[in-house]
Amino acid sequence: MWTLEDFVRESNRIEGIGEPTSAEIEAHRRFLAIPGISVADLEAFTATVQPLAVLRRHVSLNVCVGTHFPPPGGPGIELRLETLLEDATPESASAYATHLSYETLHPFTDGNGRSGRVLWLWMMGSAPLGFLHEFYYQTLRAQQGWG
């Protein structure tokens, strides 16, 4: 069974980041204990794991991720994130679909992968075999119509 520390280590490894700090592990622990996620909760989490990153709520905060061009920065980013989070409940939404929408929106200037994965884990409740294992099978189910 994977521990939270294993999850954080895997999440960092996906980004090419070294071993997690105690502050990063604690930020994950705090986030997972929140009953309902808000934009402010994601901002607080991201400030710990990527201190210079900010929410792209200002018009000039545009980013490019490889060949993906997320929506331009501005007030619409925060509004879209609020809408995404309103729908992001473990009971009513797919963690897989929410994660894809979050990464497509790319609401922060940096740290979106790790903040997106902690949101995914919050929705899942647990990932006994880790993010990559669970997300791999979620992707297969989504693409091939598996139950």
Predicted features along the sequence, with ranges:
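FIC/Doc superfamily catalytic core
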Residues: 1-147
